[in-house]
């Protein structure tokens, strides 16, 4: 959990390698010190990300299948999927009872349906680290139940899930540790 102004955006961008300070400071992720030869793409390959910001970058003419498939490549532009990748996406849509959305364009979906597609996108490559920033924004109770139920049944012991939220009740039961970021002061010392 976090308070507004607590540094959440900076912390997440450090984890994902999107912040220049991720390489300028002594940091390790996945057992490797940053700046020791891994590319940002090596890091991103092990991370599944959902955020309100990423939602803005998707072409609304993309189908749900295309949008979810971009998770294999850590980009927001669709690429050709292998049959194995497409089958993985279809399997997740089936597990989330979303097969009716798979061929629909994002523009023809509600915000909640789009967010579910992006949640599936974060899972397609079975990453070791899931970072979900406000994942349930726009989802109704049934959708949230579907996601949390999936987590209860499918999270692996070697996976880590970081959920960033303002609301304690949105933290899935699969999360067994919590930390509230304190408010940062206006002064940097």
What kind of feature is each model-predicted range?
Residues 119:
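Hydrophobic anchor residue at the start of the ABC signature
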Residues 130-134:
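Catalytic Walker B motif of ABC-type/P-loop ATPase nucleotide-binding domains
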Residues 141-142:
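Helix N-cap at the start of a conserved alpha-helix in ABC-type nucleotide-binding domains
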């Amino acid at each position: 959990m976090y308070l507004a102004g607590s540094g959440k955006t900076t912390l997440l961008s450090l984890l994902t390698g999107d912040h220049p300070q991720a390489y300028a400071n002594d940091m390790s992720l996945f057992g490797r010190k940053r700046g020791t030869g891994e590319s940002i793409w090596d890091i991103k390959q092990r991370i599944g990300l959902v955020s309100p910001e990423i939602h803005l970058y998707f072409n609304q003419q993309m189908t749900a299948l295309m949008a979810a498939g971009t998770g294999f490549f850590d980009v927001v532009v669709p690429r050709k999927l292998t049959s194995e990748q497409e089958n993985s996406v279809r399997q997740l849509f089936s597990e989330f009872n979303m097969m009716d959305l798979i061929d629909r364009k994002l523009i023809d979906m509600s915000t909640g349906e789009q967010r579910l597609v992006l949640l599936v996108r974060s899972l397609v490559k079975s990453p070791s680290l899931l970072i979900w920033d406000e994942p349930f924004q726009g989802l109704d109770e049934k959708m949230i139940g579907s996601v949390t139920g999936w987590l209860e049944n499918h999270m692996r012991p070697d996976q880590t899930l970081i959920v960033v939220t303002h609301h304690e009740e949105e933290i899935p039961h699969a999360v067994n540790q919590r930390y509230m970021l304190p408010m940062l002061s206006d002064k940097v010392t």
